[in-house]
Amino acid sequence: MPSILLLNGPNLNLLGTREPHLYGTTTLNDVETVAKELAASYGAEVECLQSNHEGVLIDRIHEARGKSQAVVINPGAFTHTSVALRDALLGVGLPFIEVHITNVHARESFRHHSYLSDKAAAVIIGLGTFGYQVAVKHALENLVGLEERK
């Protein structure tokens, strides 16, 4: 069965309670449930992992080779700091989509640079948690080549 890996970086486990004026009240569990339901409508699955630890995310990216067809990732603060995460994504050769809940370009200047964006198949910012649905749908249709089952 085709599979998408959905990764979330540091502090995203706090979705729903962390700065709801920025991130909304949708929880990470809600995001993952919707992503899995969407993938199922394409005959695919979504595997989810959230970690506050860079090495855990990197290890899971390495494990995705041969198992997943694409990666959807919200790297959180690692967006702006992690060359290692970039290298892991490039090293496994899987297409990936970068997601950010807020418009990072409208926030503090240190959030404007991403180590991933120039290599991502797509970058989705500022759509709130709906951005995950856009990313999963795009990955399934355009990176994996599936059509939604009617």
UniProtKB/Swiss-Prot annotation:
Enzyme class: lyase
Key words of the record: Lyase, Quinate metabolism
Domain of life: Eukaryota
Transmembrane segments annotated in the record for this chain: none
UniProt-annotated site: Transition state stabilizer, residues: R18
Matches recorded under Pfam families: DHquinase_II (PF01220)
GO molecular function: 3-dehydroquinate dehydratase activity
Active site: Y23, H100
EC number: 4.2.1.10
Catalytic activity: 3-dehydroquinate = 3-dehydroshikimate + H2O
Binding positions (substrate): N74, H80, D87, I101, T102, R111
Gene Ontology terms: biological process: 3,4-dihydroxybenzoate biosynthetic process; quinate catabolic process
Listed PROSITE patterns: DEHYDROQUINASE_II
SUBUNIT field: Homododecamer. Adopts a ring-like structure, composed of an arrangement of two hexameric rings stacked on top of one another.
Family matches, as NCBIfam families: aroQ, PRK05395.1-1, PRK05395.1-2, PRK05395.1-3, PRK05395.1-4
Protein name (database record): Catabolic 3-dehydroquinase 2
Species this protein is from: Aspergillus flavus (strain ATCC 200026 / FGSC A1120 / IAM 13836 / NRRL 3357 / JCM 12722 / SRRC 167)
